[in-house]
Structures are given as C-alpha cells and as structure tokens.
Regions:
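A generic structural signal for residues embedded in beta-strands
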Residues: 13-14
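SH3/SH3-like beta-barrel fold
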Residues: 32-40
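Intrinsically disordered, low-complexity, charged/polar segments
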Residues: 40-65, 107-121
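Amphipathic, interaction-prone secondary-structure segments
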Residues: 65-90
Length: 127
C-alpha cells in the first residue's frame, strides 16, 4: 500500500501474519521507507500491509442489515443510508440532506476506503 492511500485510524492487514492493525501514525524512515505505527506503538513497514476486503462479517458487526434487493443497508438518525450491493461487491453511499434528496456515490472494495466515506458522515467502523 502507498502512504497516500491511508488516513490515521484506517484498518489494514499485515501480509506476514494476517493481523489487523489500526494506523495511528504514518511516517518515513530513510532505512525502511514508509512506515506506520499501530496502537500499541509497534512500527511496521507499509510494504508489509494490504487492504482488508469488505465482507459479510465486517458489515454485520458494524450495524449493517441484509435487505433483499439492495444488499446491506445501514441508516442513522440523520437519514443517511449506506447500501452495499451484493451483486457487484461495490458500496454506494447515499446521503439525505435536510429537505432535498441528493445522492453522493462512492464505489469501494476495501475497509479503509469505506472508512474514508463513512468518516465524512461522522460514522466510525470496527473490525
């Protein structure tokens, strides 16, 4: 992964052992290139991480519900809904603004990309 793909708080998976880590800091070291620090202070190289594919378990754990014909849906008190299409493995974020209905679409395949979209709606996810 590249440093410009990540934000603080993103979830990634280490290639060497499959562990999930949450990025707490991103920095560059001359001898190792781009690195990240996870919550326990351990430092790992970005070359040793990969994105986490979005799957059923992660979506259910984060409050999404299976809805026939739409895939997975999550709505909050502000009228925001997130629809995950089951037929093409893409995520579409639909946002309701006050009285007007506007659609803002963002297609994604990985957990960190979903985090970026949901952060804009002030929604955090867990792994």
């Amino acid at each position: 992964m590249n440093a410009n793909e990540l934000m603080i708080g993103d979830w990634v998976r280490r290639k060497t052992n499959g562990e999930y880590h949450r990025v707490c800091e991103i920095f560059q070291r001359p001898e190792h290139g781009w690195c990240y620090k996870e919550k326990f202070g351990l430092i790992n190289e970005l070359s040793d991480v990969e994105p986490i594919k979005i799957g059923h378990d992660i979506l259910i754990k984060n409050g999404f519900e299976v809805e026939d014909g739409a895939g997975y849906v999550r709505e909050d008190a502000y009228g925001r809904s997130v629809i995950v299409s089951t037929w093409d493995c893409n995520i579409k974020v639909v946002h309701n603004y006050d009285i007007e209905f506007n659609k803002a679409f963002h297609w994604t395949f990985h957990v960190h990309e979903l985090q970026h979209v949901l952060n804009a709606c002030n929604v955090q996810i867990n792994i």
